[in-house]
Amino acid sequence: MTATAPVITVDGPSGAGKGTLCKALAESLGWRLLDSGAIYRVLALAALHHQVDITSEEALVPLAAHLDVRFIAQDGKLQVILEGEDVSNEIRTETVGNTASQAAAFPRVREALLRRQRAFREAPGLIADGRDMGTVVFPDAPVKIFLDASSEERAHRRMLQLQEKGFNVNFERLLAEIKERDDRDRNRPIAPLVPASDALVLDSTSMSIDEVIQRALTYAHEVLALPQQ
């Protein structure tokens, strides 16, 4: 059952709309959801909760291998559940972010989390949100989507998000940060940010989120022959 459960992977750069699309797909299809971008933060928080030495690869590996985490999409929002507790806000703190960066530096921790991510593949299906879901984590996924947008559009979206939260932000600075991250992600030696050869590439620059969701759903139904709802 686990090996044959279908997977829809959604990869792409930050700000392209992956999270919104994946939540909508998971809710529409009633499938499980994996937010790979949050998983290192969840591991970091678990390490802090259990007072595990974050500088010890030996100590982190078993925690990563048995990480008790679920991602729930509901009403367009993502809930991150660690050991039965909603930690959606807690994983976004600076302390957790710094700890996550340390944990991600260990090869054996990365390998343990790779196996843990693959274990999310269960019936009726999985929506996998990330940067290397279709190329590394689920290379055999029947539906692969690469969601992109211009760096200017992504910076604009990020600026609006931050302004809604009351932050005063500089567009040019945001744009420079996004371009720098893009360059780093696309040129890294391990798992660079590139579309899988068999991925549907969607450029959301001039598309509404509803258009993106409908295009992705139509494609998934075509490939998987899913029953129309």
From Swiss-Prot:
Coiled coil: none annotated. Disulfide bonds: none annotated. Its EC number is 2.7.4.25. It is an enzyme of class 2 (transferase). Keywords: ATP-binding, Cytoplasm, Kinase, Nucleotide-binding, Transferase. One of its GO terms (biological process) is nucleobase-containing small molecule interconversion. CDD domains: CMPK. GO terms for molecular function: ATP binding; CMP kinase activity; dCMP kinase activity. The keyword Cell division does not apply. This is Cytidylate kinase. It comes from Serratia proteamaculans (strain 568).
